[in-house]
Amino acid sequence: MININCNDDFLKDNIVNLLDQKKFFLNNPHNIQYFFQSNIIIKEKNLEISTSANKLNLNLPLSFNEFFEKFFDMISNEKVYLQNYEYYPFKQLIKKNEKNIFLSEIQNTIMSNLLLNSNNGIKKIDLIKIIWPNDKDIFFNKLDTHLTNLKNYLNSESDFDLKFTSKSGLIKLVFN
């Protein structure tokens, strides 16, 4: 969901590795789709982190926990506009006016991957592997149940009508 750019490859590799250990939603190296891009520039005595909407300067040295906390605070306010809603992937939140709809981890993973792949869709098998990477058995009906539950949950919490098509093992969002 986020692409990291850095002026120091060693620093970037370490940051990506540590964020990955925290189960932070980074973009897949084989997939160029992401919601946001973060630029990290190391200077003499500080680390400059920026997104399209925010900029942060951190004094060096700093602990990874401090970096992660500040980075997460900054990136969690990034949003994607979806119809008349704001989707905050890092908060697992969909918002319209003052109405907040909180998503479970699986619901958020489904929503983010449907949005990231809104142009061409995503293969069901790929989505299953993202959600349940350790499952040896693949059950398409398990994914279908979660898709239906997400659609029903959004509809019950608001007037959000999640529409998608499923053809030949490919799921794609449908926008009005």
Where are the model-predicted features located?
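Short, charged N-terminal beta->alpha structural module
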Residues: M1-N31
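Short acidic low-complexity segments
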Residues: F24-N46
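Basic, amphipathic DNA-recognition helix from helix-turn-helix-like DNA-binding domains
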Residues: N39, K43-Q83
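DNA-binding patch around the recognition helix
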Residues: S76-P89, K95-K96, I101-L103, T145-N176
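Short amphipathic alpha-helical recognition elements used for nucleic-acid or partner binding
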Residues: K99-I131, L150
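Short, positively charged loop/turn segments that connect secondary-structure elements
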Residues: P133-K142
